[in-house]
Amino acid sequence: LAVKSIREICGQYKIESLMTFGGEPLIYPEVVCAIHKMATEMGIKKRELITNGYFSRKKERIKEVVKSLEESGVESLLLSVDAFHQETIPIDPVKYFAKCVSNSKIHIELGPAWLVSKEDDNPYNLRTKEVLKEFEDLKIPIGAGNVIFPSGNALKYLGEYFDEELSYSSPYDEDPYDIRAISFSPDGSILNGNIHSKKILDILEEYQP
């Protein structure tokens, strides 16, 4: 359905970029590759993937998936590595994945999540800097990453690190009256509809904030 939706959207709109992310998208690498293959065929120039890089411990499987990503047309990859991901994700298979990607035609950057700000001197940011050092020998550039916004679980479990006197605004909120990007949820939900029950073009045309 995702592949079909991309084809239909590109038939009606000029799409400049496509990104697959999660959850962890590479748990389903065949789906990710099918999506990027269609994006390539439809002339979408910017094709990105965000992943934590952990979907297998087997080196042959990791190499196989990277080759498939390259062949499907993935242009750039943002690898999420930081204190939060590495609490539960082993670093060795992720580092091997990063090495394989850096040896391919796919541009790769490390994308850490910072707590409060990159400059803030808290234990999570210090740990993130330690994690990033693990990748220094691969000479992979470090991107801007993202800053954790104080809402939901972040506010519940990390609230002590945020200044109660400050007013925070999410950098990820979009104006519902000026939609520049759309995002598909794993269950097919998008905007006010679902592609399992309605055609994507109908959802877009009937959208109301």
Identify the residue ranges that each predicted region occupies.
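Short glycine/serine/threonine-biased micro-segments
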Residues: 20-21, 51, 143, 150
